[in-house]
Design a protein with these regions (language model features):
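Alpha-helical multipass membrane-protein architecture
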Residues: 1-669
């Protein structure tokens, strides 16, 4: 057949390194780093990068893109004859870099908008600044992972499973069935596109249904809301009922307990005073509903405190792993140098260490020299030094942790919080604790977050390459290409979404970015309602002591219920499908999971497109394309003889039924 039999991933051989045989033997030379592989990888990086930004701002979470990209690549590259498994691997490698960089960007850089009024963070929320920080962080994550590859991927093969990387290799090796798998993903994309187009663009039915009690009710200002979106159903199906239930329980506490309680105890005049003290204008307050006023004045900070404490708990829990990772990985540099001369095989060629060092120094120089980034000369020099120190620390940690627990469980938020706390304390100790240095501290946190996120993805991709017989240096250059290409669209997506709908609004609450801003402001300005933040921290600690995941619960406590309830519903749909199918655990390659992945991709990409429609002016600038399209739907809804909320539930229930139908199918892959 021309290739070696792949080693088993399920059992641990006595000497995994010696017995490992990649799918493509090292002595074989097959097409790998080709133009079509780079082109498709870049395209997927752009698409999944934009999709990830949308989802991260909306729900504070992301979905791994490597397996969906591998599935789609296998199908699309079949258009070209003689497409190889190594070309498909390059496609998913480049594409996954876009998704991981987008996650790091969306979790941190929008925090520029939420810093103290005197910090001037908005001035650095520009396309050029976003693109620069994203590119520096993403490339740094790739570079710092290079000297660790031999230690973590090769020497610890059989010890560090790298679950997503191994699963992706299995997908590539099972490429004969790629057409069926890709059809399921494309089907989900098509269904979500049509649904979202009719729903969000043409407004043929409401985007959300809600119930709010009156201020005079027994339970005043209680609110239940459900956003009728395909992407949230897909996310919920992927996460499952347990995580979805934990998330919605946080929203239940906020909107059905805390806000009604505050409504009974806090007078309207006091709420007004507190909002004005937080910097809200009277005009903005007048435009808020009563529930929104209580959320902006109080529960938003309770949620931020909960997320902060949850991140700290996650960091403390992983501290033994972090210490062990550092101890076991610090020898990787010398190990890679010692083995470099003997590495003659194609499958052992890494990017030269000299290039890594030169690249890291060059990135630090870019940070210190560019005027588009925050801080004076001293601030930028400190930013460059702290970026290198914290960057190498948490790239090392992230690269090892994802090998043990997978990228989905990587405590990126905790690492970023630790970076922000350390950076802010360094600045304060040097007398640079004013508001003007908040954007500088946040920039360090953003770069480290992006680097750690991309290092985790890089590790999984290199594990996939190790199993299928890829050339590491080609993957590493592919990752750099994926980072650079995706940064162009990531910045545009953030700009469009903020300009069209407003980041920080109910539509895009950006919970992770709000958390990062809270940490920076808390250390450097002390101008925060600490009482409510500490209440949230105490609640998260209580939830953890009850044996529940504090981060999922805390994110739910911060998010609007309109975001968490549909995720829970999606999880319930998976539970129903599992019961119907008679299988407890569903494979990532099952019809239901692949269809749900398509729903997420189709829904989020169409959501990004709506922001573009919003930016296209019509009627001489008095209107826009999205408003005109939604006007057609409003005219249609006015003719309907039934309640509009009931009408909106009909297509949503049909979509839910379709998800169950796809989920109950037996896995044929």
């Amino acid at each position: 057949m021309g290739h070696a039999e792949p080693s088993s991933h399920s059992s641990k051989p006595s000497d995994p390194v010696a017995e490992h045989k990649p799918f493509i033997a090292p002595e074989q030379v097959v097409p790998e780093f080709t133009f079509k592989a780079i082109l498709f990888g870049s395209l997927f990086g752009i698409l999944f990068g934009a999709s990830t930004v949308y989802l991260a701002l909306k729900a504070g979470l992301t979905v791994s893109a490597s397996i969906p990209i591998a599935v789609l690549s296998i199908s699309l590259l079949r258009i070209f004859k003689r497409a190889t498994i190594l070309e498909n691997n390059i496609v998913q490698t480049i594409g996954s870099a876009g998704e991981s960089v987008a996650a790091g960007v969306a979790f941190t850089i929008p925090a520029m908008l939420f810093l103290s009024p005197g910090a001037g963070g908005e001035a650095y929320f520009t396309y050029a600044s976003i693109m620069t920080l994203a590119a520096v962080g993403g490339i740094l994550g790739v570079l710092f992972m290079v000297p660790l590859r031999r230690s973590l991927i090769v020497k610890e093969h059989g010890t560090l499973p790298y679950p997503e990387g191994t699963a992706c290799a299995d997908v590539l090796i099972a490429g004969e069935k790629g057409g069926k798998m890709a059809g399921l993903v494309f089907g989900g994309v098509a269904v979500a596109f049509v649904y979202k187009l009719l729903n969000s663009v043409f407004a043929m039915w409401h985007e959300a249904v809600a119930w709010v009690s009156k201020k005079t009710a027994v339970l005043p200002n209680a609110k239940v809301e459900n956003e009728l979106s395909p992407e949230f159903l897909g996310v919920g199906y992927i996460l499952g009922p347990k995580i979805g239930g934990i998330m919605v329980s946080g929203s239940v506490l906020t909107f059905l307990v805390i806000i009604p309680l505050l409504s009974m105890l806090v007078a309207d005049t006091r709420v007004m005073e507190d909002l004005l003290a937080l910097g809200y204008t009277q005009a903005k307050i007048d435009g808020m509903s009563e529930v929104t006023r209580y959320r902006e004045a109080y529960t938003r900070y309770i949620g931020a405190g909960a997320v902060t404490m949850a991140g700290i708990i996650t960091l403390i829990k992983t501290m033994p792993t972090i210490v062990r990772s550092l101890r076991e990985s610090m020898g990787a540099l010398s190990g890679s140098k010692a083995g470099a001369g003997a590495a003659q095989l194609r499958t052992e060629r890494d990017m030269p260490i000299a290039w890594v060092a030169i690249g890291a120094v060059a990135l630090a120089g870019i940070l210190a020299a560019l005027p588009i980034l925050p801080g004076g000369l001293m601030g930028k020099l400190m930013m460059a030094v702290l970026m290198l120190v914290f960057g190498f620390l948490f790239v090392t940690v992230s690269s090892r942790i994802v090998g043990l627990i997978g990228s989905s469980s990587n405590p990126i938020s905790g690492m970023t919080i630790a970076t922000l706390l350390g950076t802010a304390l360094v600045f304060v100790s040097m007398g640079m604790g004013g508001e003007a240095y908040q954007p500088v501290a946040l920039s360090v946190g953003a770069i480290v977050c992006i680097a750690a996120a991309n290092a985790g993805a890089t590790s999984q991709d290199l594990k996939t390459g190790y199993l299928v017989g890829a050339t590491p240096i080609r993957q590493q250059w592919g990752l750099v290409i994926g980072v650079v290409v995706s940064t162009f669209v990531i910045g545009l997506t953030l700009q469009f979404l903020h300009g069209s709908f407003g980041i920080g609004s109910d539509k895009f609450p950006a919970p992770q970015a709000t958390l990062m801003a809270t940490v920076v402001k808390g250390v450097m300005s002390q101008n925060l309602p600490w009482g409510y933040i500490l209440v949230g921290a105490g609640l998260a600690l209580m939830i953890y002591m009850c044996g529940v995941s504090p981060l999922a619960w805390a994110v739910g406590a911060y998010l609007p219920m309109g975001a968490t309830l549909p995720i829970f519903i999606g999880g319930c749909l998976r539970w129903v499908a599992d019961k119907w199918r008679g299988e407890k655990d569903e494979s990532e390659l099952s019809p239901g999971m692949l269809f749900a992945t398509g729903l997420v991709a189709g829904g989020t990409l169409t959501g990004v497109a709506t922001s573009v429609f919003k930016a296209v002016p019509t009627d001489g600038g008095n209107s826009d394309l999205l408003t005109d399209a939604q006007g057609l739907g409003a005219s249609f809804q006015a003719l309907l003889p039934i309640d509009l909320s009931l009408w909106a539930l009909i297509p949503y229930l049909l979509l839910a039924a379709l998800v169950i139908y796809m989920g109950k199918k037996k896995t044929q892959i």
